[in-house]
């Protein structure tokens, strides 16, 4: 059973789905084109998250492609690793698909994802020789000169990037009291504790 947070940027709210079965369709996904198990991929976490916009981008891609898209990896928690330090997989908005398919099929999936214009980034096929990567990153990266970083999280923010922050703080032993995607007082206290520990204040 999984607990799923879905950030709705249109309403700036976090929706919560408790006790989802692995074969249940992902909330906001088109029909039964993406199951919780497929979205989870190799993650062993019980708590997962994504955004309505990522699901909308998935739906547009799936409709344009017109057939099933095998999902190898989507969600990962930051402490599970397997991706770069600012991976959009940790935000629940990235998909690595098409593993085990032919080059021609991957080219069709890539073309469909690109044509939707719904993804923030569709990785060039030259960088992903045996899969297709696309993600629906959002916000402005905190570091200038890049499009791949995470946005700044501030007190009062509510989104999946706050969930990453809370997850990382909890993994380091600085408890945020909860994992809810809301940057409140306990998250701020935990963050300041880490900043002091590493001399970042």
Q: Predicted regions span which residues?
A:
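Catalytic cores and adjacent binding grooves of peptidoglycan-active enzymes
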Residues: 4-8, 85-95, 99-172, 181, ...
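Active-site acidic/histidine clusters and adjacent loop/turn architecture
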Residues: 1-68
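Active-site-adjacent loop/helix surface patches within enzyme catalytic domains
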Residues: 56-90
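Extracellular LysM carbohydrate-binding repeats and other cell-envelope/extracellular binding modules
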Residues: 187-201
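Surface-exposed patches in mature extracellular/periplasmic domains of secreted proteins
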Residues: 67-75, 119-126, 178-179
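Amphipathic alpha-helical segments that form well-ordered structural scaffolds
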Residues: 56-60, 164-168, 190
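Short, surface-exposed alpha-helical recognition segments that flank or form part
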Residues: 45-49, 157, 178
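Surface-exposed loop/edge segments in extracytoplasmic proteins
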Residues: 174-176
């Amino acid at each position: 059973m999984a607990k799923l947070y879905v950030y709705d940027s249109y309403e700036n709210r976090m929706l919560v789905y408790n006790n989802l079965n692995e074969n249940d369709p992902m909330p906001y996904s088109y029909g039964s084109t993406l199951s919780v198990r497929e979205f989870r991929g190799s993650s062993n976490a019980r708590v997962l998250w994504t955004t309505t916009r990522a699901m909308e981008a998935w739906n547009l891609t799936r409709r344009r492609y017109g057939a099933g898209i095998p999902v190898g990896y989507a969600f990962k928690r930051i402490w599970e690793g397997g991706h770069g330090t600012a991976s959009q997989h940790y935000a629940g908005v990235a998909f690595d698909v098409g593993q085990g398919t032919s080059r021609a099929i991957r080219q069709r999936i890539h073309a469909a994802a690109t044509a939707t214009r719904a993804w923030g980034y569709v990785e060039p096929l030259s960088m992903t020789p045996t899969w297709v990567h696309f993600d629906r990153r959002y916000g402005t990266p905190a570091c200038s000169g890049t499009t791949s970083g995470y946005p700044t999280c501030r007190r009062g923010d509510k989104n999946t990037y706050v969930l990453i922050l809370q997850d990382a703080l909890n993994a380091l032993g600085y408890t945020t009291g909860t994992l809810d995607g809301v940057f409140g007082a306990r998250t701020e206290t935990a963050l300041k504790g880490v900043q002091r520990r590493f001399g970042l204040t």
